[in-house]
Swiss-Prot record:
Belongs to the universal ribosomal protein uS15 family. SUPFAM superfamilies: S15/NS1 RNA-binding domain. This is Small ribosomal subunit protein uS15. Signal peptide: none annotated. InterPro entries: Ribosomal_uS15, Ribosomal_uS15_bac-type, uS15_NS1_RNA-bd_sf. PROSITE patterns: RIBOSOMAL_S15. Keywords: Ribonucleoprotein, Ribosomal protein, RNA-binding, rRNA-binding. One of the primary rRNA binding proteins, it binds directly to 16S rRNA where it helps nucleate assembly of the platform of the 30S subunit by binding and bridging several RNA helices of the 16S rRNA. The keyword RNA-binding applies.
Amino acid sequence: MALDAAKKREIIARYQKHENDTGSPEVQIAILTERINHLTEHLQVHHKDHHSRRGLLKMVGQRRGLLNYLRENDVERYRQIVESLGLRR
């Protein structure tokens, strides 16, 4: 369930802090959110795909960890990313 390169570049361009930024928490959270949304749609059709469900739970946990890190270190950036991605928190 990987993102295609064009979609990934678009997400990176939208959330990066500077030209070469591909690993900031905001970028990682945005990419994970897109992958989670894609996998959620897949699981609604293929509800017995437990292997993908495990991958989804792993990605959700990874995103949760990044969000916790961002909240502890920069609350304003945390609030911006949660609002822009429409995450519940």
